[in-house]
Amino acid sequence: MILFFIAGSQVMSQIPSGYKGTPYKDSVYQTGAQNIPGRIELAFYDFGGEGIAYHDTDTANNGSLLNRSEGHCRPGISESICFFRENEGVDISYTKDWADFNHPNKTDPKVNQLYIGWQEDGEWTNYTVDIKVKGRYRIVTIYGNHDNGSTLWLNHTKLTDIKLPEDTGNWHYWTQATVAETTIEKTGLNLLTLKYNSGANLAYLDFILIEAID
């Protein structure tokens, strides 16, 4: 077990020895490890690059490539959204007026919500998370399209399957759903891995505490 000091507080680390990734942070979106309970924004995967913080089957960020096309970086939208993490391989885009809000959604995503798309079988992303409470958790996400056989892993041990219960019929037709319930028996800094296959646009994972445990 390793102790870290974050913002003056001592935090235990359960992160596997030898992991070289570090929590995502920049001046706009995020400062350090994401918290559980709380929302894990999937675009905020760790720094560290291919094979460490993520695995993608090609080197291009296909979301940024698309958003370089005419009409895809919408008027008034900052480049920090249109071309988020443009030089990395994970494929990230954002919700747009003419693609995501020009039809009824069962649940509307946030305007300019970043999401991971263009997924291929065997890809994954890593997240340094700070687990505040041991307990039973409900996991909720907002997604478009259909189930893609995702799984969540904690410190290289499988935590749960992620089951997207409904086929929305389109990558840009969004709904929100409970996709798993699981028990987390660790606190402090931990390594959360999302492994996914082709089939869905995924925006975030909300970890909602059902019941704390000792």
Residue ranges, per PLM feature:
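Bacterial Sec-dependent N-terminal signal peptides
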Residues: 1-14
